[in-house]
Amino acid sequence: MDSNTVSSFQDILMRMSKMQLGSSSEDLNGMITQFESLKLYRDSLGKAVMRMGDLHSLQNRNGKWREQLSQKFEEIRWLIEEVRHRLKVTENSFEQITFMQALQLLLEVEQEIRTFSFQLI
């Protein structure tokens, strides 16, 4: 895993946790939780790829890993749409920059997960 990606996740999560979006703070907390979950999932896939041949172990641990992979892609798509929406409605430049960086990170992570999953298939 790229150390820049790790610091990007940490930076964006820290920035998002500092935002005060009024009534939508509950939604923002949900986004933060999903970002953290996505990071952990991406990391676990990356570790499995690093141990090449770990597909059988991955399948034994979680017989529904393809279903889980599909669910993660749905979460990524939802997060991308949510971040795009927030980017459109916010007028605060700090929030705009944070959401633009979050969007870029989501797109990068989506590509990484696709790459990892193809290597495991």
From Swiss-Prot:
Transmembrane segments: none annotated. The keyword Transport applies. GO terms for biological process: exit of virus from host cell nucleus through nuclear pore. Keywords: Host nucleus, Host-virus interaction, Transport, Virion. Disulfide bonds: none annotated. Pfam families: Flu_NS2. Gene3D superfamilies: 1.10.287.230, S15/NS1, RNA-binding (1.10.287.10). It comes from the Viruses. A motif (Nuclear export signal) lies at residues 12-21, 85-94. GO terms for cellular component: host cell nucleus; virion component. It is found in: Virion; Host nucleus. Its main location: virion. Belongs to the influenza viruses NEP family. Mediates the nuclear export of encapsidated genomic RNAs (ribonucleoproteins, RNPs). Acts as an adapter between viral RNPs complexes and the nuclear export machinery of the cell. Possesses no intrinsic RNA-binding activity, but includes a C-terminal M1-binding domain. This domain is believed to allow recognition of RNPs bound to the protein M1. Interacts with protein M1. May interact with host nucleoporin RAB/HRB and exportin XPO1/CRM1. This is Nuclear export protein. It comes from Influenza A virus (strain A/Turkey/Wisconsin/1/1966 H9N2). The gene is NS.
